[in-house]
Amino acid sequence: LERSRGLGDVYKRQDYIQVDETTLPVINHDRHKAAKEYIWIVRAAVPRLLFFHYDNGSRSQKVAVDLLKTFKGYLQCDGYSAYDAFENRKDVCLCGCLAHIRRHIESCREENREYAMQGLKLIQGLYNVEYMADERQLSYEERAVLRQRLAGPLLDAFELWLQNTYPKVLKRSLMGKAIAYAYPLIPRMRHYLYDGRIFIDNNRAENALRPMVLTRKNMLFCGNRQAAENTAVICSLLGSCKECGVNPREWLNDVISRLPYYLTPKSGKNLTELLPDRWVGCRQSHDTLPTVPGMSMDNPRTVRR
C-alpha cells in the first residue's frame, strides 16, 4: 500500500478530471466515537481511472489545492466553494455539473411547482441533446458542433430564466437558494459546449462513490486515520478495475504475483504498468518477468527454503 500511494500522480497528469467528495466515518480515539470525516475522489475520464484521497479527513479548500496543485486542464466539479480557488488559475478550466443544478431545482417542486417545472423543462432539453448525440454515436468533434447548435441556445434560455425568476421569489426560499446556487455556475457550464469529451454533469464521479456508501454500511467505520488512508488506496485500485471493465479478483491475483518482480531494484519495472487500464497489455508479457532469487516461478508467492 505504501508504494501505491504515489500512483495518484498518474491520474492527475490527465487533462480532464472529475472531482467529488463524500463522508467517511473514522474513529476519534480521544472522543471514543466515530467522527464524520471526508474522502475525495478524482476520476480521470480518459483513461477511466479513479483515485481516492484522504487527508486527515478534511474537506477544506487547502486539501483541494494541494491535491490538484500540479493538475492542468478541465476540472469538473459541483458548486462547493473549495473549488473556487481554481477560478483564477489560467491552466485550469472549471466545468460545471448540471445534475447538481437540477437537484437543487427539483427540491423546490413542493414549495413552488410552477417555477420548478419551468426550470426542469429547460434542463431536460439540455440532456435531450446528449441523448441525441449518444444515439447517433457522434465523435467528440461532432458532439461539440451539435451542442453549440442546439444546447447553446437552451443554456442561454436557462440563464435568462434564472435572471427573470430570481426577483419573483424570496431569497431565503428553496427556489431562491436554488437559483442563487445555479446562476454563478452558468459560465462554468458553457465550457462543455466546446469540447465533446466533457460530460454535461459530474455523475460518473458520483457513481464511482456509490461503492463507498456501501462500504460505509458494511464496515461501519475506519478504526483510525491510517486505516482510512489504506481504504483510499484499496478503493482507488479496485474502483479503477470496475471503471476499466477488469475483473478485480483476476487483477488482484495476477498483480500480487507480479509485485515481487516489480519491487526488485534491478527489475527496471514501473508499478504504473500494473494499473488496471494498462494491466491487460502487461499481462501478456508475464513469461518475460525477471527471476527473483529464492522465489518459485510456478508460485511467485512461495519462497524456496
Regions found by a protein language model. Give the residues of each.
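Single conserved hydrophobic/aromatic residue that forms the stacking wall/gate
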Residues: L1-Y11
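Two-metal-ion RNase H-like nuclease active-site motif
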Residues: R13-H29, C77
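Beta-sheet entry/capping signal
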Residues: Q14-I17, I39, L49, K72-Y74, ...
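Conserved beta-strand -> loop -> alpha-helix junction used to position metal-binding or nucleic-acid-contacting
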Residues: Y16, G79, N88-K121
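Short helix/loop capping segments that flank catalytic or ligand/cofactor-binding pockets
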Residues: V26-N28, L50-F52, Q61-K62, Y83-F86, ...
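Short conserved beta-strand segments at catalytic cores or DNA/RNA-binding microdomains
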Residues: K33-P47, L98, C241
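Electropositive, glycine- and tryptophan-enriched low-complexity nucleic-acid-binding patches
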Residues: Y38-Q76, H104-E106, G125-E141
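Acidic/histidine-rich catalytic cores and adjacent linkers
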Residues: T70-G73, Y80-A82, K121-R305
